[in-house]
Amino acid sequence: VGPENPGFRTSFPIVTTLVLSHPACLDHDTGPGHPERPGRLRAIAEALDHPRFARLRRMDAPGIDRAAVLRVHPADYVDAIEAAAPERGRVYLDPDTPMSAQSFTAIAHCVGGVVAAVDEVMRGGAKNAFVAMRPPGHHAGTASPMGFCFFNNAAIAARHAQAAHGAERVAILDFDVHHGNGTQEIFWSDASVLYASSHQMPLFPGTGGRDERGDHDTIVNAPLRAGDNGEIFREALETALLPRINAFHPDVIVISAGFDAHRRDPLGGLDLVEEDFAWATARLMEIAEKHAKGRIVSVLEGGYDLEGLARSAAAHVETLMGA
């Protein structure tokens, strides 16, 4: 995946793209054989350690912003997650979602990362940002961990943009192979946030049908079938999701950037390649330029084949850079 690949060319000027990470995210120990593992972040870091990414602005994520978390999750839930971390070994909050001694520190820095990303993008310190951190968040509901997720990072980003920076409308596009049931639940009755998702169905967690539209018609789902390729993915975005995001006139766009729809991924059955994620990123950049001064905050979700993840994240970031 090099700069000579015309598939990643965009018409955007060179922009300041911020990448946030923190070494504590490597210490969230999910145990042997768990797909949501520290090697995911190492693979992304290695992919971004290339001369063509020299222009990236990089930042270590700060610690938790509790006020930002409490805009999404109740205090007793936040306290319970913090208290659940064991002194040694692992505890399972559900069959897929273990915590180790250092897990809450990683979770806290994820929150700090999305808050800092929103702050920088909304203040103009960066045009857009990619939060390359774990654990992911889009399965976490208001008060429920699920599917590797504890706090909903994308939801925290959206609410922080509104509360701290005056954004009236936030659009979230989620292209993870799994439906972001937690994000959908959180914003089901919120007319100020549009949640748009492409995902495989049937597949975990089982939500995301076209008839799930929210109380204010601000939930838009475009389910795909196993085996669907990039052409079908792009058509779904062009016909079902992107027009709705454009018509919503968002003040900032949040991306739940899951790369497990890649054809190499062991947890999904779609047939996407990295160029498809680059294309989706470029289309969102066009909408962001039109309505949101180009402001995009992208938050890592899934992606469990290390090569597919690395190639996809690199294509995504290279597109964000306007390269």
Predicted segments — roles?
Residues 1-12:
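Intrinsic disorder/low-complexity segments
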Residues 12-323:
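HDAC/HDAC-like amidohydrolase catalytic core signature
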